[in-house]
């Protein structure tokens, strides 16, 4: 999503010894960024949509193998996010091992109900600390629950 350039991951800021090279075309990267943003604006990653920070991401839910058989309610969920989607600077990868079904999730244990909202909360807290400039474009504001909610037509949380 960064234009198609691989950068060796590091925990060090301004690490000069990074291995960088092109792995996919710029246009393919741009298209993937658009698709991954759609996961958060219109798909199973909606609960990670942090107004102003253009989160993009991919959800994942995998049934666990127990005694040679996949078990429906034993899953690992994941969410790989990047932000801001227009110019990705940060990535966040979350995994939950066997999340429990809750009343609030109507018993669902897929990524969109547990890993995704947790990632959204983390991003909403760390983005300002990382000095990521919020971008409240008009289209995002129109789609947001803030503008949709009115006294005549309240929006459920």
Regions found by a protein language model. Give the residues of each.
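C-terminal, active-site-flanking charged/polar segments
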Residues: 86, 112-129
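Extracytoplasmic/secreted envelope proteins and their assembly/folding machinery
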Residues: 29-36, 77, 116, 120-123
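Short, Gly/Ser/Thr-enriched beta-strand-loop segments that form substrate-interacting elements
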Residues: 51-84
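Residue-level preference for non-acidic, small/hydrophobic
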Residues: 32, 58-60, 80, 92, ...
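Conserved active-site-proximal loop/helix segments of enzymes involved in bacterial cell-wall
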Residues: 1-50, 101-112, 129-153
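Solvent-exposed loop/turn segments at secondary-structure junctions
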Residues: 39, 61-63, 85-86, 96-101
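Short, well-ordered beta-strand elements
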Residues: 80, 88-107
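Extracellular/periplasmic catalytic domains that process cell-envelope and extracellular macromolecules
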Residues: 71-74, 82-88, 145-146, 154-155
